[in-house]
Curated annotation (Swiss-Prot):
Function: Is required not only for elongation of protein synthesis but also for the initiation of all mRNA translation through initiator tRNA(fMet) aminoacylation.
Lineage of the organism: Bacteria, Bacillati, Bacillota, Bacilli, Bacillales
Quaternary structure and interacting proteins, as annotated: Monomer.
The encoding gene: metG2
Reactions the enzyme catalyzes: tRNA(Met) + L-methionine + ATP = L-methionyl-tRNA(Met) + AMP + diphosphate
Protein's UniProt name: Methionine--tRNA ligase 2
Cell compartments where the protein resides: Cytoplasm
A GO biological-process term: methionyl-tRNA aminoacylation
Length: 544
């Protein structure tokens, strides 16, 4: 089976925060799992280097947009790598390859009659002497009356036109823009109304889209899909490939999602492999992002794919809700965030991954708390998982000189592990990652209870053969926990694999155990709870 996984493209205008990772982490879990199953996986993403936010940041810092994009693209690559993300292709939207692919898609839509020209009114700043891109216009949402940008309201998820905003102002200088006429290209989105409606109905029947994606898209369909501009007067981006319009750029909402397509083509060129199997309608596709990106993946991207004649549209939409920080809405402008480069300097990446999975905003907003983060590490990763691994392997090191005791796999334990693989695999495929991880840790707690009830420290003297059986089965459990947890906690799983000399990485029970165990090291270190206050002081002290 071919599996295509697309992770949303973060804007290269500032560091990643935990909200980004909470929404993107499911993609890596899926990729690792399906590779272990032996499926043909293509997992792609990249940095959005063309968006208006990059131009704004560059202007604020007095540097070029390219310098800003380069800085954060490199930082993103480093952060994703250090967190264990296994993208097959992580690229950027200002690459020549991406520009060519997007322009080809634009021309194909134009040829098929899905794009047309239209004279429209647009916000114009007399002070800045320029037409304002949608993100350059700020004001009040006409629907929920919260602060909003000209393209979308984050509060109610409404897709907006800048002219819809109340109390409009230029983001650059704060003045009230005038309204002037200009010509733009439009995408005939309304022509895909029935196909999008059918896609939502199928997703509802199969449960392959998150509830928030279904509800929001149903709302858009009920209101009637409106044609959207596909060109804008932007300072950076992909030029319109039509003579006389080269000074205009392809609007980022259609250009950025086409990044999945361009990344796929780039991967094919780089590897010499064929990517057609990921776009022929037979592939299982997953699109992973936050709920603010729902309309771009449930409406815009399917319409683009249908418009260019591709056989597949998003089958699974994994759209997480928001992550708050210490019960407050995350705000990059106010510096109320936990920044990824910062937290990676001091904490194990598996600790970060674990917390963001068991507290994932899968169906509702969830909160990142420094207290809960540190206590979950100490009680679950160290106290439950690390404790079971460490006391089992240390027992072998101390009483058997590192030689693996002889034994046979307990039939009941074998059955339990086989059922666990099936249950966890099904949960992952259904994008219920929290359920999957919690199921494994239920088994870890069972393993600790098994160790305590068998009392190998007493069996060693009273019944040495039973003691060997106990420890043998504990190692069997450890080997399989490492395999089951690899999609979630890859770094600690790798440490266990190295200790146990496990080569097989397939998604199946591990029955081959090592003959010898050397150099046993703690799987996790305890985090001093005093760090809670230190982190809170740092967080509150950095607020703008």
């Amino acid at each position: 089976m071919s599996i295509f996984i697309g992770g949303a493209w973060p804007y290269a205008n500032g560091s990643l925060h935990l909200g980004h990772i909470a929404s993107l982490l499911p993609g890596d879990i899926l990729a690792r799992y399906y590779r272990a199953k032996g499926e043909n996986v293509l997992y792609v993403s990249g940095s959005d280097c063309n968006g208006t936010p990059i131009a704004i940041r560059a202007k604020q810092e007095g540097v070029t947009a390219k310098e800003i994009a380069n800085k954060y693209h490199e930082e993103f690559e480093r952060c994703f790598r250090n967190l264990g993300f296994t993208y097959d292709c992580y690229t950027r939207t200002d690459s020549e390859h991406h520009h060519e692919t997007v322009q080809n898609v634009f021309l194909r839509l134009l040829e098929e009659g899905h794009i047309y020209k239209k004279t429209v009114e647009q916000a114009y700043c007399e002070t800045c002497t320029q037409f304002l891109p949608d993100c350059y216009v700020e004001g009040v949402c006409p629907h929920c009356h919260e602060e909003a940008r000209g393209d979308q309201c984050d509060a109610c998820s409404a897709i907006l036109d800048p002219l819809d905003l109340l109390e409009k102002k230029c983001k650059l200088c704060g003045s009230t823009p005038s309204i002037q006429e200009t010509e733009h290209f439009y995408f005939a989105l309304h022509t895909f109304q029935e196909q999008i409606k059918r896609a939502v109905e199928i997703a509802k029947q199969t449960g392959t889209w998150r509830d928030n994606a279904i509800q929001l898209t149903e709302r858009y369909v009920k209101e009637g899909l409106l044609d959207r501009a596909v060109s804008r007067d932007l300072p950076i981006g992909v030029p319109i490939p039509v003579e006389g319009y080269e000074d205009k750029k392809i609007y980022v909402w259609i250009e950025a999602v086409t990044g999945y397509y361009s990344a796929s083509k780039h991967w094919a060129e780089e590897t010499g492999k064929d990517d057609r199997e990921f776009w022929d309608g037979e592939a299982k596709t997953y699109y992973v992002h936050g709920k603010d990106n729902i309309p771009f993946h449930s409406v815009i991207w399917p319409a683009v794919l249908l418009g260019i004649g591709e056989g597949t549209i998003p089958r699974h939409i994994v759209s997480n809700e928001y992550l708050t920080v210490e019960k407050r809405k995350l705000s990059t402008s106010k510096n109320w965030a936990v920044w990824v480069p910062d937290i990676l300097e001091r904490y194990d990446p598996d600790s970060i991954r674990y917390f963001l999975i068991v507290n994932a905003p899968e169906n509702r907003d969830t909160d990142f708390s420094w207290r809960e983060f540190i206590y979950s590490h100490n009680s679950e990763l160290l106290g439950a998982y690390g404790n079971f691994v460490n006391r089992t392997l240390k027992f072998i090191e101390k009483y058997y000189g590192g030689i693996m005791p002889k034994g046979s796999i307990d039939v009941e334990l074998k059955d339990k592990i086989e059922r666990l693989y099936k249950h966890v695999g099904e949960a992952i495929e259904q994008t219920k990652f929290k359920v999957a991880l919690e199921s494994i840790f239920d088994a870890v707690r069972f393993a600790n209870k098994y160790f305590d009830e068998r009392q190998p420290w007493k069996e060693r003297e009273d019944d040495p053969v039973s003691c060997e059986e106990t420890i043998y089965n504990c190692v069997y459990l450890i080997a399989n926990f490492a395999n089951l947890l690899e999609p979630f906690l890859p770094f600690s799983s790798e440490r266990i694999r190295n200790t146990l000399s496990i080569v097989n990485r397939n998604w199946e029970p591990q029955h081959t155990l090592p003959s010898r165990i050397d150099s046993v090291q703690p799987l996790f270190e305890r985090i001093d709870v005093k760090q809670i206050e230190c982190e809170l002081e740092k967080l509150y002290g950095a607020v703008k």
